Amino acid sequence: MKIRDFDYHLPKELIAQSPVEPRDSSRLMVLNKSIEHRRFSDIVGYFEEGDTLVLNDSRVIPAKLTGKKSTGGHVEALIVSKSGTGYECLIRGKHIREGTRLYFGELGATVLEVIKNEGASRYVVKFNCNGSLSDILEKIGDAPLPPYIKQKLEDRSRYQTVYSKEKGSIAAPTAGLHFTNELLRRIKEKGVSIAYVTLHVGIGTFTPVKAENVEDHRMEPEYISISTESAGIINETTGKLVAAGTTTVKALESSCVNGKITAKEGFSRLFIYPLYSFSSGIDAMITNFHLPQSTLLMLVSAFAGRERLFAAYSEAISNSYRFYSFGDAMLIFR
């Protein structure tokens, strides 16, 4: 299977630059036996008593830092993950090498020192700062918005789901951005169970597929946690099992043993693309419209069927749906 099989043309004006208000006023394309055009708030009507909705409660950390080198040159750093006694970072700037010191925050009080160059703008660094790194990031860090979003986000909470809890993602699980607390309340009132899983979105979100053959791509590890309670709720589902987002699908598939969800804490490199055999019993998934040639588009193609999905994307473009992180949503039934 070739990477070009997952390419499509999207007019730039359809790339959403900001979220809609309220959250659930975004458009919803329902892909079932036919295509329906709705608002996200209408999703309540597709749930029935006995269904279970699974949500990823990961919270985005303000992991993007903007600062200067000792020479005064501008630099940006994205904190990716813990790495031994240091942290793995993506750093944008010229002449970054081992021993380089970078300065962030008021009067450059937070100092980052490069201790290893791993190539492709990836570095292992150590921090010299007063207080915990988590607290420092909350004070001086920014939401790590995707590069295709050029507009400044005034309200950082709009890049968080209303139910986000567990800190650790460097990108939002965007399918969940459409939910409001009121919408979740209405869904529960229908007799729908809600289960939470955690998958921290990692560097793989920013890593393009460079292999010509899709099968040759290797995913970066992502942290997953599913509690015994959540596994029980999911396994006791008598109606439809609905997963909100590609991250939730990946978490469920990564923790499924003999058709049952098991409690899990660890890392997953699971790569889902067409011809993958789903085992967790997901009946429907909620997702946004994804970038061409991305692993997220491949996952959704595996779930919906590539030709079926690309026909839906073509109709979405014709109907001026908004794409990507702050864009509109799909509800896809298998």
Language-model segments: which ranges?
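Surface-exposed, charge/polar-rich loops and edge strands
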Residues: 1-334
